[in-house]
Curated annotation (Swiss-Prot):
Belongs to the NAPRTase family. One of its GO terms (cellular component) is cytosol. The keyword NAD does not apply. This is Nicotinate phosphoribosyltransferase 2.
Amino acid sequence: MAESAFSERIVQNLLDTDFYKLTMMQAVLHNYPNAEVEWEFRCRNQEDLRLYLPAIREQLEYLAGLAISDEQLAFLERIPFLAPDFIRFLGLFRFNPRYVQTGIENDEFFLRLKGPWLHVILFEVPLLAMISEVRNRARYPAATVEQARERLQEKFDWLRREASAEELAGFKMADFGTRRRFSYRVHEAVVSGLKEDFPGCFVGTSNVHLARKLDLKPLGTMAHEWLMAHQQLGPRLIDSQSAALDCWVREYRGLLGIALTDCITTDAFLRDFDLYFAKLFDGLRHDSGDPLLWAEKTIAHYLKLGIDPLTKTLVFSDGLDLPRALKIYRALQGRINVSFGIGTHFTCDLPGVEPMNIVVKMSACNGHPVAKISDTPGKAQCRDPDFIHYLKHVFQVA
């Protein structure tokens, strides 16, 4: 009998999350322990999720019972930039359901988070994985792990046919597939398959639990929330990106040096990304807009600053599949180092399955609105049109 795609648990433990949530959480503990934030769920493809509300609430109750184990803490202790006080804090951490509101409003499912940033930050990824798997259990109950493995093997076969041995030797790819995965069981099977048989260079996973279980490197630095929160954490709005980068540098002293460019827009980011930051950070991550236009812009910026682009890395993570990644790799080969983070294309690709397009984004910090504009208009998010208008004015965004 074929192995079901679904196991009893959806979220396995506290480490079943993206690594950058932990790196940001440590920075919040050390720098902004009293910051208050609000988050809002959004389903970009307008799917009706009301039917799944009871199951989602049941999973929230399960989350509240999770505690990190001594073995998991020991794994984190081996990561040199995670500080002892942060490890101790994680040992005490519990998900608190009082910070989560769910229900139906205007005939639509809603989910909101409100509370201390330090205690809310870890909710995002498991919530998204829960909602995705609850919906998939209802819509695709007969799905099997073998279907995911077969799709993965087809992709490997395609890459072997299309790419030369020389190209494969430098084609670096990581799993970024936790938040919109079809199910945990599929996710584990996919990452195991990538480790064992990926034709290029599989460099690790963003999922901390799977990194520990499968002896892989956990990957990730910062997300949009880090830059968004700084819009209301004290500095002048025009200085918020610089303040976010500077705080990151002080926290990690040159480690975890991949910065995200599109919180406002890449043009606005590069105006703040001066020689100081460009030397300190190892590279940049692309998450919206045309990837090759973005790459040309960032390469030109490094050259203008007198920095050899071949000493820097560009990470691409915006809705990638292998054909898109290979196209980008070929266009930039020999000009700058590149790496790819692929998510849904690997972890939610089964026959007949339509992946969800869901996000949980920060909407306010310390009682005031924050915004993400991005290089793709459809990815913009802000609940206050006046604030986003002001933000565009301050950063000279059309």
